[in-house]
Curated annotation (Swiss-Prot):
Outcome of swapping T308A: Inhibits insulin-induced activation of endogenous Akt1, insulin-stimulated protein synthesis, insulin-induced activation of glycogen synthase and insulin-induced phosphorylation of 4E-BP1 in a dominant negative manner when overexpressed
Organism: Rattus norvegicus
Source lineage: Eukaryota, Metazoa, Chordata, Craniata, Vertebrata
Site feature (Cleavage) residues: D462
A GO BP annotation: positive regulation of smooth muscle cell proliferation
Function according to Swiss-Prot or TrEMBL: AKT1 is one of 3 closely related serine/threonine-protein kinases (AKT1, AKT2 and AKT3) called the AKT kinase, and which regulate many processes including metabolism, proliferation, cell survival, growth and angiogenesis. This is mediated through serine and/or threonine phosphorylation of a range of downstream substrates. Over 100 substrate candidates have been reported so far, but for most of them, no isoform specificity has been reported.
Domain AGC-kinase C-terminal: residue ranges: 409-480
Name of the protein in question: RAC-alpha serine/threonine-protein kinase
Amino acid sequence: MNDVAIVKEGWLHKRGEYIKTWRPRYFLLKNDGTFIGYKERPQDVEQRESPLNNFSVAQCQLMKTERPRPNTFIIRCLQWTTVIERTFHVETPEEREEWTTAIQTVADGLKRQEEETMDFRSGSPSDNSGAEEMEVALAKPKHRVTMNEFEYLKLLGKGTFGKVILVKEKATGRYYAMKILKKEVIVAKDEVAHTLTENRVLQNSRHPFLTALKYSFQTHDRLCFVMEYANGGELFFHLSRERVFSEDRARFYGAEIVSALDYLHSEKNVVYRDLKLENLMLDKDGHIKITDFGLCKEGIKDGATMKTFCGTPEYLAPEVLEDNDYGRAVDWWGLGVVMYEMMCGRLPFYNQDHEKLFELILMEEIRFPRTLGPEAKSLLSGLLKKDPTQRLGGGSEDAKEIMQHRFFANIVWQDVYEKKLSPPFKPQVTSETDTRYFDEEFTAQMITITPPDQDDSMECVDSERRPHFPQFSYSASGTA
């Protein structure tokens, strides 16, 4: 779509994701799916270039509700493999109808456009430009992946939206982590709408420190992501046992994380957003693997809708708490928090009371143990700046600014990417099914996958429900 135009604009009340107050925002909806909000109505081009909120309504799901306020509507979609929601309200039912109709019209137009692109691409499967969006049917015409093709070995994690299981592919003997999400949580049963799956980001990402996606497929009641399995355990697990890492060990892990985030930002134009120790795994050799296993730990029922407090609040950046637009700099805040934990043995800000915790994140100055070296203090101070524009990595140079910091002075970044640096710790795993570095709370549990009403194959997907997840299925070419 070459000509981007404003479809609708006006004032909306947006509810904060974390501090649940309502804030007036002036929103612009564009025909490319962009849905951007400002504190004041933008008067010129310069003001339009710095929105507080920046969302996409592409193939979103819309829900109307009268709670927690009358004339509320909710936009729900998948961001990577995590469900996100944004809540708005207006003064009258007519206003709500105007907004939801406009949003649905834009989403439908984008869906048609994508289908036309898909039709064009599917005619030339050898064209790699469209490979990330091809169905399994295109990659392997005679075969569709089903749940029956895996042995289910051990539970690796569990949450509100589903579970992560260690599986073995029967045909190849290869081990993977399968993330299984329940459709009923993602798609309201009484809504005929489309849910965006940004799993194409995972499909098309190739980086040594990012978890690769091997397959994604759906059954009539589940979405399944089959991902590379790193059995060196969570960094959280290792840090919990050792309490603190040396600066050299933290530097090694930090460099691999920076390399991966640089790739996502510069090559994929993606903000990871959810950097925390639990999402950092080690592979069998001790290298970092950033995962997307994110399962919401707790679900909070809020009125008529399921409002989920996803993620660990200790990692939230100030701009996220203030409900401002967050760009790439949010990932550098996350890097600051995890590196602080590694080198200091505790979180930079902590309080069991969430409101007090948020106040600390927004207001409290960072403190360091006396044992920390000057370069480490300088790095962490830069990464944990409250103002994202002043943060290390917050400028146009992004990751390059962090790479040039004196804490990383001895790091050769190409060597990092090529895994030429020796890991400071090598996991003592004896086999691919060795889960000693995973929480026994999960691995000791029996695996239960509730039997569906009919065979769990792609063919059984009810044609009425299948369109909820268009172009969801995927198979990586070659080996993951």
